[in-house]
Every structure is written in structure tokens, then in C-alpha cells.
């Protein structure tokens, strides 16, 4: 039990009989047996408590890993949703860009077909086209030199 051989146990029993006497020896043996039983129960209880704590620590580690996995999965789903939203926005912007480019192409076609027709149809240009150019003023001052119209 404790690494003792048979001769050592006999020596301890003889010493116990000498010190305790035959009257008290049975009571002492019962008390020693109860002590070892209690000691064994305490050791087993401590062992089971330690094992439970180790299991709890392992469960905590597992829970932490699962939490990290769930967090990573949630962030990847958020990124995926964000990328999907960006793709949707990109397609909307490209559609708008295409419609603007088509409008620009139509305007360019109209301009290149007959620019004079567009100028004649423009109400702002109608006033300027119908007006006669004004005569230049007789006195022009160019680079501090006076040019006077000679009559």
C-alpha cells in the first residue's frame, strides 16, 4: 500500500501491540482504518473536483473557440452582405452611367448632323443671329496708340 513489505508491517504490528497493549489495539486499528478511509475519500473528492475544474476549463476553451468561430462566420456574412450591397450599388451606378453616356451620344449625333439647324432652333441664338453686327467705334485705343477714323 505505501511501498512496505511484509517484514516491515510485522515490525509495526509488534510495536503497536507493545505500546497500546492487547486491550486498546482493536480500537486503534478501527480508528486507523477510519482515518485511511476518510483520507481516501478526501483524496478522491479532491481528484474529482480537480477533474471537474479541468472539464470546466476545457468547456470554457471550447466555448471560446465556438464563439470565435461564430464571430468569424458573422463577420464574413456581414462582409458578404456588404459586398453584395456594393455590387448592387455598382450595377445601379453603371446603369446610370450607361444612360448618361447614351444621352451624350445622342446629343453628339444631333450636333454633328446639322449644327446650323440647332443654332437656328435655339431661342437664345435667334436674337443674336437676327441682329446686325454693330459698327466698330471710330476711336479704338490699342496698346496706348490711338487709331482714329479719318473722314
UniProtKB/Swiss-Prot annotation:
Its GO CC terms are:
TAT protein transport complex
Which GO BP annotation is one of this protein's?
A: protein transport by the Tat complex
The alphabetized UniProt keywords are: Cell inner membrane, Cell membrane, Membrane, Protein transport, Translocation, Transmembrane, Transmembrane helix, Transport
What Gene Ontology molecular-function terms does this entry list? protein transmembrane transporter activity
List all Low complexity biased stretches: 120-131
The record describes its membrane topology as: Single-pass membrane protein
Q: Where are its TM segments located?
A: 1-21
Q: What segment(s) does the record annotate as region Disordered? A: 120-151
Gene3D superfamilies from the UniProt entry: 1.20.5.3310
Q: Where is the composition biased (Polar residues)?
A: 132-142
Q: Where in the cell is it found?
A: Cell inner membrane
Matching InterPro entries: TatA/B/E, TatB
Q: What does the sequence similarity comment in the record state about its family? A: Belongs to the TatB family.
**Classification via HAMAP family:** TatB
Quaternary arrangement and interactors, per the entry?
The Tat system comprises two distinct complexes: a TatABC complex, containing multiple copies of TatA, TatB and TatC subunits, and a separate TatA complex, containing only TatA subunits. Substrates initially bind to the TatABC complex, which probably triggers association of the separate TatA complex to form the active translocon.
What is this protein's function?
Part of the twin-arginine translocation (Tat) system that transports large folded proteins containing a characteristic twin-arginine motif in their signal peptide across membranes. Together with TatC, TatB is part of a receptor directly interacting with Tat signal peptides. TatB may form an oligomeric binding site that transiently accommodates folded Tat precursor proteins before their translocation.
What name does this protein carry? Answer: Sec-independent protein translocase protein TatB
The organism is: Campylobacter fetus subsp. fetus (strain 82-40)
What does UniProt list as this organism's lineage? Bacteria, Pseudomonadati, Campylobacterota, Epsilonproteobacteria, Campylobacterales
Amino acid at each position: 500500500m505505501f511501498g512496505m513489505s511484509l517484514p516491515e508491517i510485522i515490525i509495526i504490528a509488534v510495536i503497536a501491540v507493545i505500546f497500546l497493549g492487547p486491550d486498546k489495539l482493536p480500537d486503534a486499528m478501527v480508528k486507523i482504518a477510519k482515518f485511511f478511509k476518510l483520507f481516501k475519500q478526501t483524496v478522491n473528492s479532491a481528484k474529482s473536483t480537480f477533474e471537474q475544474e479541468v472539464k470546466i476549463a476545457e468547456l470554457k476553451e471550447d466555448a471560446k473557440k465556438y464563439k470565435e468561430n461564430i464571430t468569424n462566420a458573422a463577420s464574413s456574412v456581414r462582409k458578404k452582405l456588404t459586398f453584395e450591397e456594393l455590387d448592387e450599388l455598382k450595377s445601379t451606378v453603371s446603369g446610370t452611367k450607361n444612360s448618361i453616356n447614351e444621352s451624350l451620344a445622342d446629343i453628339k449625333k444631333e450636333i454633328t448632323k446639322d449644327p446650323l439647324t440647332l443654332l437656328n432652333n435655339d431661342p437664345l441664338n435667334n436674337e443674336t443671329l437676327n441682329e446686325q453686327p454693330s459698327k466698330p467705334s471710330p476711336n479704338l485705343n490699342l496698346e496706348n496708340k490711338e487709331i482714329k477714323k479719318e473722314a
